[in-house]
Amino acid sequence: SGLTQPPIPPGKTFVYEFVARRPGTFMYHPHADEMVQMAMGMMGFWVTHPKDAGFMRVDRDFVFLLNAYDIDPGSFTPKVNTMLDFNLWTWNSRAFPGIDPLVCRLGDKVRIRIGNLTMTNHPIHLHGHEFVVTGTDGGWTAPGSRWPEVTTDVAVGQMRAIEFEATDPGDWAFHCHKAHHTMNAM
């Protein structure tokens, strides 16, 4: 059943069009047969940039959507009826080592946007640098409300934008700080 229109019949398509009224980072997912469709990958992220290109300007802007799947060993098809017992954690539907590195230059101002459409929270941790949370589901955070962090918790259905200056050269880990998630690709 549809929320604002009739459901889309199997095998048919529908183009969603809307006016992006405010800048920010947003997630989407279905509201019909939600768990099955999300288990098959029907979810995503989009960024609406501000009209003023100088507002909240950064040199590098990365976006990650956290997903979780239940897939039997040797299989490629997720179990679509799993509600909480997931065994594969992904970033933009990719598992380590298939995740591209976040490449930046020394001195770059870097933003990383993380959206969580899994069924658990993820304490996202950055090695080698401190960051501030500059954005949430509600929009940009006021500069006076920010403080240095190395880990931020991204709860179910939430989005966080973090920013830092790349001051220390090298390869630095960026991961979920739940040990059993890092053992399985996150």
Q: What label would you give each PLM region?
A:
Residues 1-186:
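Copper-binding active sites and cupredoxin-like electron-transfer domains
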